[in-house]
UniProtKB/Swiss-Prot annotation:
SUPFAM superfamilies: Actin-like ATPase domain (SSF53067). Its main location: cytoplasm. It comes from Methanococcoides burtonii (strain DSM 6242 / NBRC 107633 / OCM 468 / ACE-M). This is tRNA N6-adenosine threonylcarbamoyltransferase. Fe cation binds at residues 111, 115, 132, 288. Its EC number is 2.3.1.234.
Amino acid sequence: MTTVLGIEGTAWNLSAAIVDEDDVIAEVTETYRPKTGGIHPREAAQHHALHASDVIERLLKEYRDKGHSPENIDAIAFSQGPGLGACLRTVATSARALALSLDIPLVGVNHCIGHVEIGRWKTPAVDPVVLYVSGGNSQVLAHRAGKYRIFGETLDIGIGNALDKFARGAGLTHPGGPKVEEYARKATNYVKMPYVVKGMDFSFSGLSTAATDALKDNSLEDVCYSFQENAFAMLVEVTERALAHTGKSEVLLAGGVGANMRLREMLDLMCEDRGASFYVPERRFMGDNGAMIAYTGLLMFNSGTTLPIENSHVDPSFRPDTVDVTWIADEKEVL
């Protein structure tokens, strides 16, 4: 049975995990928490560099304590991108050192695809349309003709960053998304705001700015509610279009913003109307985590994909639709 150690560190979370084909065997996470404002890339990278050795040591100890030997690990996987360049480089350095130390192959994993594959692993989803929503990314994807094709995506910022930007302007503490959700539950009125869907793409920067301006004349609760309703309706609309276009019968929600219960409710209602199945992995697998990198690395390793050390550069703009999905049989579909 294949066993892979994976390291995630594209932004906030430094997380490492060891998985086999059945389950997550061990996992350790250290989260960067800024004193004020949003993420500071240099500080986040320093955090990851400071804690990387300790996280890996604790992970290997947990692995040994469960009766396993590091000699059983077949490969080291790491988040190659997309993400913050400084954070990616820090994690890549740790992964290279570990692979050389254990004399085992290295696997570079696309962070976005990691979210998709952990969702497919930990839910009954087989061939879903995926709504991937996180801080820096918002995309609608589905597997076709050997790749995860992007059917729609943000034209500017990710929904998570839009929520955080608005929350900071409203004086809410980080992370902003859960605070916005909390206040939205107490709303009594809808405030008209921009709704921007262009073809199959969406935009959030104008909505975030409009929501901040709306605080001058409306309650925080009503603005939070209206921001969520518009943003999530845009995401659900494009997901529904992709579902109709592809003819698929499953929707998978992935990424940290997927923890929002209102977004889940809206997607669930849409899927019910269309006769599609809706899947969400448990909360621990929604945000950035080492298990998703380890498991996707396992899939890649088992399909013959490894990465020479000399080619293991990171890519802060690494798009999921550039990755050959060698671990899923090509149905020879036509786009």
